[in-house]
Structure formats: C-alpha cells, structure tokens
Amino acid sequence: EFRRVLFRSAGIVEVDGKPVMMDNGQQLEYFPLELKLNLTGSSYVKTAGARMAKYEVDRTSHSDGRQPDNDIVLFRYADALLMKSEAKVRNGEDGSLELNEVRGRVGMPYREATLENILKERLLELVWEGWRRQDMVRFGVYHKSYDQRVQLADEKNGYTTVFPIPQKSIDLNPKLKQNVGYK
C-alpha cells in the first residue's frame, strides 16, 4: 500500500493527520537545514533528511513493530509490464498496451510507448525501488551530464557503468577480457 507522508519542518504527520512517531515515542520532526555528511553524535541523527515510506509496515505483528510479518516487495507486476513494453519497443513492436496498463492503474492518460516514455514511467512507477541506475545505464543516459555536474573522464569509456569480471571467470575462460578500467 502506498502511503503519503507530508514533510514540513514541524511535526511530521501522515495524510490522515496521524503523527509519525519515532522509536523514543516523540513525534518525528524534519530538520531539512541540519543535514550533514556525518551525523554521528549529533542530535539530528534520526531527524535530518527526507524519508520515503512507500509500503505500509505491519505494526500489529509485534509490539514494537520492528519485525513485521508482511513480505517485502522484490518484483512487481508493473515492473514486468514495463520490461515487456521496453522489449517490444526495442524489437520494433508497439509496447503501448503494457505501458498504458501501468499508467491506467493510477488514472494517467494514454501515452505512446517510446523508450523515452518508458524510462520516464519507470522513474515514476519504481521510485525508491533500486532500479534507476541500471535503467539509466541500459537506456544509455547514465553519462549524460546534468546541471552543475562535471562529467568524469572515466565515464567516457564506460568504466563507471560496468562492473569488473571476476578473476575466476577469466581464469576459466581465456577468451574473456577484463572490462576497461579494471585490472
């Protein structure tokens, strides 16, 4: 279940007005200007920075709510539909049916299935699920610079988008060559 939480600098509340409580029983307060790289020992260790609560935690399974019985989401049907839409588009087919099934679930209007539209939809639908970097690499936009960001020299040869091939694999198959940037 998607849960929206209102962020402001006073006490944090859920959409229904219920206060969000910290583990010490106090209402959570958001201190956006107190964000630091090292919060160790700071009173803001638990209150700095924004939070995302995408899935409801089963707080009734244990008295402290720390060991919920509900399962974590690993793969979602919407992700499978977006993958199918992408595969169709990459094969020269129309992937609009799958893309718009995802969009229709939340009342969004029809959109043509293009790689650009699919990437945008993956950003919106799969936010905070850990797929964005790999999506950007796969769609070839990971290296595109954005405002205020300097492009690193190593990015031009792909060093920052691929992982090293394990040495054991190279030893087993002499035809494998290590990816550029790794020794």
Residues covered by each model-derived region:
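Structural motif corresponding to the intra-repeat A-B loop/turn of tetratricopeptide repeats
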Residues: 89-91
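A generic secondary-structure boundary signal that marks alpha-helix termini
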Residues: 86-87, 127
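A generic alpha-helix propensity feature with a strong bias for hydrophobic helices
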Residues: 22, 35, 78, 167-169, ...
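Long, intrinsically disordered, low-complexity segments
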Residues: 64-67, 71-74, 103, 108-183
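Flexible, polar/acidic helix-loop-strand segments at domain edges
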Residues: 3-76
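Structural register within alpha-helical repeat arrays
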Residues: 77, 84-86
